[in-house]
Amino acid sequence: MKKPPVPLLQGGVRADGRAPDQMREVQISVGVISNADGSAMVSYGATTAVAAVYGPREMHPRHLSLPDRGVMRVRYHMAPFSTKDERKSPTPSRREIEISKVLREALEPAVMLEQYPRSRIDVFIEILQADGSTRVASLTAASLALADAGIYMRDLVIGVSVGLVDGTVVLDLNGLEDQYGEGDLPVGYMPNLRRYTLLQLDGAWGRDKLLEALNLAVKGAEFVYQKARDALKNRYMAIAEEIYGR
C-alpha cells in the first residue's frame, strides 16, 4: 500500500482537522432543477452530488413494464471535471455502471413501487466534485429528489461512509482516507424504520470494529437526516408561500 502524502490520523485528529466521529460540513438543497419532477443537491465537504428524478411516467417500450409494480432506473455519472483524473471517454465506466446498480438496490426498499404499476421512475445522479464518499452522498441526494418528486416512500435513505484509518474507525471518508485507509464501509440507512439498505464492506474488519462502525454510521445518518428534513421543510414552505402568498 502506498504511503499517504500526509498522516491520516495523528493524536486522535484527522488530516482535515476532524475528530474520528465527525462528519464534514453537510449542505443540502432540495428543488434545485426546475425542469425535473424532483431534485436535490447534497455536499459532504468537497464532495457534491446532484440528483434529478423524472416520473412516474409510462414505461417505453411497454414490454419492459411490470403489471404489479413500477420500474426504477438509476444512472450515476461523474462529471469530467469532478476529479483531477483525465476522463478519456464520455461513455459510462464499469465503476459507474456498478454504482448505478448498487444505488438502485439501496433505494428500492424505501420506494413504494407497487403504487406505480406499468410505470417507470428515472433517477439521474451527477457528481460535480469528488472527494471521497461519492456513492453515499449520491444516495442521500437521490432519496431527497424522490421525496421532492412526490414519490410514495416508506422512509428516506441516508447514505454515510465509515472506514478504518490507522486502526481507528472514522466517519465520512474524504478522498485521502478513501484512497489510503485500511477499509471502508458505505452504508444506506432508513432512520425511521431503523433498517439498512446498503452495506458494502471492503477491507479486513474484526467483529468489534465492524459493530463500532455500524453504530457510528447510524449516528452519522441521524445527523444527516435532520438536515435532510430541514431541507425538505424549507422546500415545502417555499412552495406554500408561492401558492398561497404566505
Swiss-Prot record:
Its main location: cytoplasm. Gene3D superfamilies: GHMP Kinase, N-terminal domain (3.30.230.70). Coiled coil: none annotated. This is Exosome complex component Rrp41. Its EC number is 3.1.13.-. Catalytic component of the exosome, which is a complex involved in RNA degradation. Has 3'->5' exoribonuclease activity. Can also synthesize heteromeric RNA-tails. Component of the archaeal exosome complex. Forms a hexameric ring-like arrangement composed of 3 Rrp41-Rrp42 heterodimers. The hexameric ring associates with a trimer of Rrp4 and/or Csl4 subunits. It comes from the Archaea. Keywords: Cytoplasm, Exonuclease, Exosome, Hydrolase, Nuclease. Belongs to the RNase PH family. Rrp41 subfamily. GO terms for cellular component: cytoplasmic exosome (RNase complex). It is found in: Cytoplasm. It holds the Pfam family RNase_PH. SUPFAM superfamilies: Ribonuclease PH domain 2-like, Ribosomal protein S5 domain 2-like. GO terms for biological process: gene expression; rRNA catabolic process. GO terms for molecular function: 3'-5'-RNA exonuclease activity; RNA binding.
